[in-house]
Regions:
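Helix-to-loop junction immediately C-terminal to a conserved catalytic motif
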Residues: 80
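Conserved signature/switch motifs of ABC ATPase nucleotide-binding domains
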Residues: 156-159, 177
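Conserved ABC transporter NBD signature motif
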Residues: 88-100
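Catalytic Walker B motif of ABC-type/P-loop ATPase nucleotide-binding domains
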Residues: 182-185
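The feature captures the beta-strand-to-loop junction immediately N-terminal to the Walker
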Residues: 65-67
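Short coil-to-helix segment of the ABC ATPase nucleotide-binding domain corresponding to the Q-loop/switch region
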Residues: 117-125
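Hydrophobic anchor residue at the start of the ABC signature
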Residues: 171
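Conserved ABC ATPase "signature" region
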Residues: 128, 135-153, 205
């Protein structure tokens, strides 16, 4: 008869090795594998994305940059589970995304606030939809408003707020439930330059405090360089990944850094690429 101790030894699972643990920790947070998206239109099929493969690390600030129509927003909607892929797979922590995700915050170019609710009330709308405890949610909302410089504006309605203030409220609403990932689709595109600068600084501070994983869609080269760990440059439609650029600049970043040779070097690298691809044209 086999020895009981031997049987026990055979059925025990070995502890994970350091290599296995390292592999798990290095697993991408968000991954696109051979992703293609084709839209049906009256004029025939339109291929918005073509064979896009990309892995985002947990806690990474990743910007997607490219010309209009290259599929940037489509990529974000696929990441959110709000669109099905025509081909390919989207995964989060190794699990396939095949339905709208509930573990994210989303910020669009338009704040989309309810006019009959105050700034605080608009933020708490997200908490109510998720059935979060009221007292702790309100405390969190006030902390977020303070973090973006809106203390004292809690009871203001959207028509009493500037465009930049409304977008700050939208960002707070997206963060009320402590999402591990924030998806942002050109959130500062409709704002004036000074307001954009302030919101970029606010976003950097929020990201630095929480280190959530951010997927950021933008047309602004300087904005992408300032905020990102990596910048993904897309080709014109059908959108493919043209270049992946690591941004090796110290954090936290300051507005004065935009005048440094290092910052301008990244700017120039991306602009030269866009010129070479015909996205930009000089006289």
């Amino acid at each position: 008869m086999p020895d009981d101790g031997l049987l026990t030894t055979r059925t025990q699972k070995p502890a994970p090795t350091a290599a296995v643990q390292a592999a798990v920790s290095q697993q991408p947070y968000l991954e696109f594998r051979n992703l293609t998206k084709v839209y049906a239109t009256a004029d025939g099929p339109v291929r918005a994305l073509d064979q896009v493969s990309l892995a985002q690390r947990q806690g990474e600030f990743l910007s997607i940059l490219g010309p209009s129509g290259c599929g940037k927003s489509t990529l974000l909607m696929l990441a959110a589970g709000l669109l099905p892929a025509s081909n390919g797979v989207v995964t989060v922590r190794g699990k396939r995304v095949d339905a709208p995700r509930t573990d994210i915050g989303i910020v669009f170019q338009s704040p989309v606030l309810l006019e009959w609710r105050t700034a605080l009330g608009n933020i708490l709308l997200q908490a109510e939809a998720r059935h979060l405890e009221r007292k702790s949610a309100e405390r969190r909302a006030r902390e977020l408003l303070a973090a973006v410089g809106l203390t004292g504006f809690e009871a203001k309605y959207p028509d009493e707020l500037s465009g930049g203030m409304r977008q700050r409220v939208s960002i707070c609403r997206a963060l009320i439930h402590h999402p591990p990932q924030l998806l942002m689709d050109e959130p500062f595109g409709a704002l004036d330059a000074l307001t954009r600068d302030q919101l970029v600084l606010d976003l950097q501070r929020l990201w630095n405090d929480a280190r959530m994983t951010v997927l950021f869609i933008t047309h602004s080269v300087a904005e992408a360089v300032f905020l990102s760990d990596r910048v993904i440059v897309m080709t014109p439609r059908p959108g493919r990944i043209d270049r992946v650029i690591d941004i090796d600049l110290p954090r936290p970043r300051t507005l004065a850094m935009r005048e440094t040779p290092e910052f301008n070097g990244y700017n120039r690298q991306i602009l030269d690429l866009l010129l070479a691809r015909g996205v930009l044209r000089e006289c």
